[in-house]
Amino acid sequence: MRRSVIVFWRTLRSSIVCGLAMLAASDAFAAQEQQQQPTPPPSAAVQTPPPLTPAAPPRKPPPFPNRANEIMPSWLRVRGEFRERVEGVDNAGFTAGRDDAYYLSRVRFSATATAKNIAGTIQLQDARVGDKSIGPTASPFTASFDVRQAYADLGHATSRLFARLGRQEIAFGDQRLVGHANWLNSGRTFDAARVTFKTKPAQVDVFAASVVRILPGEFDKSGNGNRFAGAYASSGRVIPQGTIEPYVFWKRDINQRAENGIVDSLDHVTTGARLVGKLPARLDYNIEMALQRGTLGPDEIRAWAGHWQIRETVAGAWTPHLTGEYNLASGDKNPADNVRQTFDQLYPTAHDKYGLADQVGWRNLHHLRAGFDVTPIKATPISFNYHSYWLAERRDALYAASGAALARVPGGAASRRVGQEIDIQASRPLTPQLILAGGYSHLFTGPFLEQATPGKSYSGPFVMVTYVFLAEK
């Protein structure tokens, strides 16, 4: 514990110094430019009367390092982003004394060239991890310098027909099933073709893709037997004061292990819908349900999942919101009956969906959340959340946010009770280009984790600085 605190403090101190240096540099450039402005001539003897309505103050120009696009031709735009995050872990694997603290550094550079009805974008990325002594250090912690995105846009994003071809991010809805996972140091992209159709009543996205694998020492690649395709629609004309988003996703993967131990191909379809909207009494809701059917070799796949959330906006200072939420994902009742009932969460942005600690994913799960958030200072939201977890099936595993099995009791657990978690996090933009965020999570183990693991409680603080350069924000 003492070592993790020391390392966490050192890396945190480095991140804070780095952020303050960026802020100081931006202010210095701005101050220098103000000093270089010519001194206005003395006022004339006859003064012009002030206008009846005061003119709006002039817009403050961005700092010098963020003005690259002002000197670029109008058809070319660039943007850079540097992100530094310090993470700490106490009792990794729910084991006493397995403490760690490490830093995650990521740099991205993007350039977009635009013609009349076509545009091309390339994004380069380099992501590194330092001082990590427990667990893996490869992807998603490390992604050596490579092309992260490279795509062409045909048409305009606001036109009725729009296509994007190439390596790209794909995200739908709350990203519970398909997302870019940008919390991870490497993030996620697909080699894909995506076409968007827009009409007044609805929008439909159709895509065919393959997830990009981060490969150490060589260029990142897709393929390897992975196929992912589907359609996602959205309409605000069906439900009063609401939106419905039906979807269908098809996934194929090779070299997957069936219940009898043989290696075969996975092939399944996920159909579902998301509903979001407003209710009376300052309430809003968010509902999503999905059904999976398919095969993995000799196994039949029958799984489903659901998400139900209601939120109240409370009148008064600090703009408080109260949130209640329930999540369910089916688990496997019998690991030897050739029927797979564990829900596959596909390719989500899973961070903080089921707890800030990311020890729980949308598989074999019952999850309750109660939380509230306030904004006591302008542009500084603070959120507090309580989570409670149970397994859906005792003979199945507890799965992490990544989708990987985290803990299991062979033969079945004595209890489905996983544990409880409390979270707090906040963020604040120091400038339009510099954002500071931090949080802390603590997971109290229940009877299942005490049986399946050493059973010690788990905690994880983080501090993160994000700085945008070249572009305004």
What is each stretch, according to the model?
Residues M72, D99-L104, F141-D146, N185-G187, ...:
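Short sequence motifs at beta-strands and strand-loop junctions characteristic
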Residues T95-D99, A138-F141, A181-N185, S222-G225, ...:
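Flexible, surface-exposed loop regions and adjacent strand-edge segments
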Residues P51, D90-S105, A115-R160, F172-W183, ...:
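Surface-exposed loop and membrane-interface regions of Gram-negative outer-membrane beta-barrel proteins
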Residues V86-A92, A119, R128-I134, A171-R176, ...:
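Gram-negative outer-membrane beta-barrel proteins
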